[in-house]
């Protein structure tokens, strides 16, 4: 099977000092000659390291992002970061709607939609996280939840913005974190097919859908070979640069 146009990256959550982030960036830059053109690599550090990581990786094809942002350009939003600020740091991607932010910080489909529109306005690629909880899955509500989240994410896109690059990351809430149980490849692919169909109906273009949720060296190859999975969004298995490079190599061999 041959696949291309895949996205494989990692978000570090609230981890890594600036020094630790630069060790990762240095290791990734040093391995740039071994990159596979079929795979778009990306890393999403904490805010405190994003600019420096971007600068270190500027000569590579690695895209660098932020883990969140506000929808306003500026204003009385103490503690927030605006899309203007992210653009000023020369970042490429912004992660939006992660389940931890939905659960602990009151993110809603509406706020994710506002942020998506703001990101596109400022030339950032939104990486929108969606996923059902265990209770929703067991109640047979997964597909309904995913459809609502996708449509909410795109609700404020208008005109040309509806054709701008966007990414979706399917991260079932029960599959992420230390105690997460990875979705089976079949289950994940079925959800990806639905998500892709809903997104294409909403925007009129194909939207890449990445899988995230306890991705590791043991399951990355089976996952990436599924027909509707367009990439991998990796957690702790890729927080060490060696682990990230290992998964990249496994994916490249598999496709």
From Swiss-Prot:
<dbReference type="GO" id="GO:0006096">
    <property type="term" value="P:glycolytic process"/>
</dbReference>
<dbReference type="InterPro" id="IPR020861">
    <property type="entry name" value="Triosephosphate_isomerase_AS"/>
</dbReference>
<keyword id="KW-0312">Gluconeogenesis</keyword>
<dbReference type="GO" id="GO:0006094">
    <property type="term" value="P:gluconeogenesis"/>
</dbReference>
<comment type="subunit">
    <text>Homodimer.</text>
</comment>
<dbReference type="InterPro" id="IPR000652">
    <property type="entry name" value="Triosephosphate_isomerase"/>
</dbReference>
<keyword id="KW-0963">Cytoplasm</keyword>
<dbReference type="GO" id="GO:0004807">
    <property type="term" value="F:triose-phosphate isomerase activity"/>
</dbReference>
<dbReference type="InterPro" id="IPR035990">
    <property type="entry name" value="TIM_sf"/>
</dbReference>
<feature type="active site" description="Proton acceptor">
    <location>
        <position position="171"/>
    </location>
</feature>
<comment type="pathway">
    <text>Carbohydrate metabolism; erythritol degradation.</text>
</comment>
<dbReference type="Pfam" id="PF00121">
    <property type="entry name" value="TIM"/>
</dbReference>
<feature type="binding site">
    <location>
        <position position="214"/>
    </location>
    <ligand>
        <name>substrate</name>
    </ligand>
</feature>
<keyword id="KW-0570">Pentose shunt</keyword>
<comment type="similarity">
    <text>Belongs to the triosephosphate isomerase family.</text>
</comment>
<keyword id="KW-0324">Glycolysis</keyword>
<dbReference type="GO" id="GO:0046166">
    <property type="term" value="P:glyceraldehyde-3-phosphate biosynthetic process"/>
</dbReference>
<feature type="active site" description="Electrophile">
    <location>
        <position position="98"/>
    </location>
</feature>
<dbReference type="GO" id="GO:0005829">
    <property type="term" value="C:cytosol"/>
</dbReference>
<dbReference type="GO" id="GO:0019563">
    <property type="term" value="P:glycerol catabolic process"/>
</dbReference>
<keyword id="KW-0413">Isomerase</keyword>
<dbReference type="GO" id="GO:0006098">
    <property type="term" value="P:pentose-phosphate shunt"/>
</dbReference>
<dbReference type="InterPro" id="IPR013785">
    <property type="entry name" value="Aldolase_TIM"/>
</dbReference>
<protein>
    <recommendedName>
        <fullName>L-erythrulose-1-phosphate isomerase</fullName>
        <ecNumber>5.3.1.33</ecNumber>
    </recommendedName>
</protein>
<comment type="function">
    <text>Catalyzes the isomerization of D-erythrulose-4P to L-erythrulose-1P.</text>
</comment>
<feature type="binding site">
    <location>
        <position position="177"/>
    </location>
    <ligand>
        <name>substrate</name>
    </ligand>
</feature>
